[in-house]
Structures are given as structure tokens and as C-alpha cells.
Design a protein with these regions (language model features):
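Gly/Thr-rich phosphate-binding beta-strand-loop-beta motif of the actin/hexokinase/Hsp70
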Residues: 1-23, 100-119
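Short glycine-rich, Thr/Ser-proximal phosphate-binding strand/loop in the N-terminal lobe
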Residues: 4-44, 48, 124, 128-129
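Short acidic, glycine/serine/threonine-rich loops at helix termini
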Residues: 18-20, 74-79, 112-118, 124-126, ...
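Short beta-strand-loop/turn "lid" adjacent to the catalytic site in phosphate-handling enzymes
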Residues: 30-34, 53-86, 113-114, 122
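Glycine-rich phosphate-binding loop plus the immediately following alpha-helix
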Residues: 37-38, 117-161
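Phosphate/pyrophosphate-binding loops at sites that engage ATP/ADP/AMP, CoA/4′-phosphopantetheine
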Residues: 46-63, 202-213
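Glycine-rich phosphate-binding loops at beta-strand->alpha-helix junctions
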Residues: 70, 211-219
């Protein structure tokens, strides 16, 4: 009988689930907007992922399930709960062993993680006191541009210049962006300024400055 293993990242903004077979191949993955109740978020995502795998009827039939993320303690049927910081480190170590630093731009915080040669966490820092620089900040900027987050993420690629965003607060930054749009400034250059301001915040906050190269950005 085939064996299947699952992981559920119950994040503050999105919930992600993945199922692997016994060879390590991904056989199902789901990403859904998180609900206010993390138990329901995890259950909905797991149910959808399980439905994609022939022979599986419920998440409790998985041979092993790990819960991680903001709501990791609420993942139903989880055999183990592991912090997202440790999961990031080991996952990146397996996928790209040369990478020694990660920036995780989450829904409500930004984490910088330094990884040891065996995939364990050397050090990390986290900014969870300000919305500026988080995934929710990007979402608010996309709304200000009246486009989807996916459309917004590609907009700056067409920029020839960068218009700096000087506000350090998410609320003031949104007002500044709306003013720049009203002045007729190129939207792609404003978007580039937004993304540059977030990148600067990540580097300024992080404790992994001695291991920046090579690094991966995750969002």
C-alpha cells in the first residue's frame, strides 16, 4: 500500500498544504486564503489536497503530517508541529544546499534566517511590529493600484527608473503612493520604489548579514 506524507503551513494570510509520496515526489499541493479560524483553514486546505490523491480519503490516512506556520498547533491530525523558521531552513537545505540565508516575507512579519551546513538554524531575526514590508503591505499597495497581487508583482519589471517611497509606515506609504499616482507618475516606477523600500527594510532588520551570499527570497 502506498505511503503518503503531508505538510500544512497554516499562515496568517494563506494556508498551504503539500502531499508527498514515499519517493519524495509532490503529488498534491494547495494554497488558499486563510480564514479567521485556523482550524477551518487547515482542514479546508488538507481536504482539497487529499482529494487530489487517488486512494486517500482523509488527512488522517496520511502516514505522517507536520503542521507549521502561525496556526500550526491547530492543524487537525498533525503528528508533529514545527516552527516555520526550522521548516524554511531544512526545506531550503534540501532543495538548494548552497543557500545559507533566507528572507521570508510573510503575511504579518518578515524573517531573516541563517542556515548551517546541516540545515539547522544558526540565527534568525523577525520584524513583527510594523506592517510595512510584509505581505499585507504588498496587498494594500496592489489594492491602491487597483490590480491583483500577481499583476502588481510584475509591474516593476517594466520600470526604467525608481521613484523612492520615503514613508516608513504602511499607512503613510499608501497615502504617498496614492499621491504619486494622482500626480501622474509612472505606475511601474512607483511599484519599483515600493519593492525597493521593502528590500531595504529586510536587509536593515536582518541578523544574517555575514551570510548574505548566496540567498533566496521567498514570498
Amino acid at each position: 500500500m502506498a505511503k503518503y506524507y503531508g505538510g500544512c503551513d497554516a499562515g496568517s494570510t494563506y494556508t498551504k498544504c503539500v502531499i508527498l509520496d514515499e519517493t519524495g515526489k509532490i503529488v498534491a499541493n494547495i494554497t488558499k486564503r486563510s480564514r479567521i479560524n485556523p482550524v477551518l483553514s487547515a482542514k479546508d486546505s488538507l481536504d482539497e489536497a487529499v482529494a487530489l490523491v487517488d486512494g486517500l480519503n482523509s488527512a488522517d490516512e496520511l502516514d505522517y503530517l507536520i503542521g507549521t506556520g502561525y496556526g500550526r498547533n491547530k492543524v487537525p491530525f498533525a503528528d508533529e508541529n514545527i516552527s516555520e523558521i526550522s521548516c524554511h531552513a531544512m526545506g531550503v537545505h534540501i532543495a538548494a544546499p548552497d543557500v545559507k540565508a533566507i528572507i521570508d516575507i510573510g503575511g504579518q512579519d518578515v524573517k531573516g534566517i541563517a542556515i548551517d551546513t546541516d540545515g539547522t538554524v544558526l540565527n534568525f531575526s523577525m520584524n513583527d511590529k510594523c506592517a510595512a514590508g510584509t505581505g499585507r503591505f504588498f496587498e494594500s499597495m496592489a489594492r491602491a493600484f487597483e490590480m491583483s497581487l500577481d499583476e502588481f508583482s510584475k509591474l516593476s519589471l517594466a520600470a526604467k527608473n525608481v521613484i523612492p517611497i520615503t514613508a516608513q509606515c504602511a499607512v503613510f506609504a499608501e497615502s504617498e503612493v496614492i499621491s504619486l499616482v494622482g500626480e501622474g507618475k509612472p505606475m511601474e516606477e512607483i511599484a519599483a520604489g515600493i519593492e525597493l523600500s521593502v528590500a531595504k527594510r529586510c536587509f536593515a532588520n536582518d541578523s544574517t548579514s555575514d551570510v548574505w551570499y548566496p540567498f533566496r527570497m521567498r514570498s
